[in-house]
Design a protein with these regions (language model features):
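PRY/SPRY (B30.2) beta-sandwich protein-interaction domains
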Residues: 1-223
Length: 223
């Protein structure tokens, strides 16, 4: 009030995100991880974690959800993942048990220690995950191409179906691998890419790729 205002200094557009007390977005959980290092508001993750993961702060028991992550620095075992609350993130790699899945940069998708090969990624590529918590179906994408000829909007071509009560985004980095997640906060991934400004069907989020029809950002307004 009284025309007393702060003047922004040394701020870029990507330093301002829609996350707020009235609509809180998922980030990576700083206390639910095994040896990972976080930056950029707990959206960037690195660290040489051979057996272990980091989960997100917001999960879902029902509904359809979408998130994405940019592979800033390539390492083949670095993975975008999903896990439930029962997974032991301190001793398991993503997809080692039936309690998590992981899509690795080198092209392998893991579930219950079984691997299926899809497209590999390189630095600058973008991982995508869409999941339906009601049916347990999971889709994975690379640069807006859904693997296994998947079509999340139509419910076809999922890479895995699981029976979980609770779904949480997760991450695993190995060696020099670096991932920058976007749960709808910043489609430029901290200025590493050109922002694309795609919202979900409720008008929430700032995604690089448009979420599939019927899939939404993990935020408190959508829950």
């Amino acid at each position: 009030g009284n025309d007393n205002h702060f003047t922004p200094s040394n701020l870029n557009a990507y330093d301002v995100v829609p996350d707020s007390p009235t609509n809180n977005y998922c980030v990576l959980n700083s206390v639910d991880k095994d040896g990972h290092t976080n930056a950029e508001g707990n959206l960037e993750v690195s660290g040489n974690v051979i057996y272990g993961m980091q989960r997100g702060t917001i999960g879902a028991t029902s509904g359809k959800w979408y998130f994405e992550a940019r592979l800033n620095t390539y390492q083949g075992d670095t993975a975008i993942a999903l896990a439930n609350e029962d997974e032991n993130i301190f001793t398991r790699f993503s997809g080692e048990t039936t309690n998590s899945v992981g899509y690795l940069a080198d092209n392998r998708f893991f579930y219950n220690s079984g691997a299926t090969n899809y497209s590999s990624l390189s630095a600058g590529n973008i991982f995508q995950i869409a999941f339906d918590a009601d049916t347990g179906k999971i889709w994975i994408g690379k640069n807006n191409t859904w693997q296994n000829s998947g079509d999340p909007a139509n419910g076809t071509g999922s890479v895995q179906t699981v029976s979980w009560n609770f779904f949480l985004p997760a991450a695993r980095t190995v060696g020099s691998g670096v991932l920058h997640y976007n749960f709808g906060q910043d489609s430029s991934f901290g200025g590493h890419s050109t922002a694309q400004n795609n919202a979900d069907g409720n008008g929430y989020g700032d995604f690089y790729y448009a979420p599939p029809t019927g899939f939404f950002a993990l935020n408190t307004k959508n829950l």
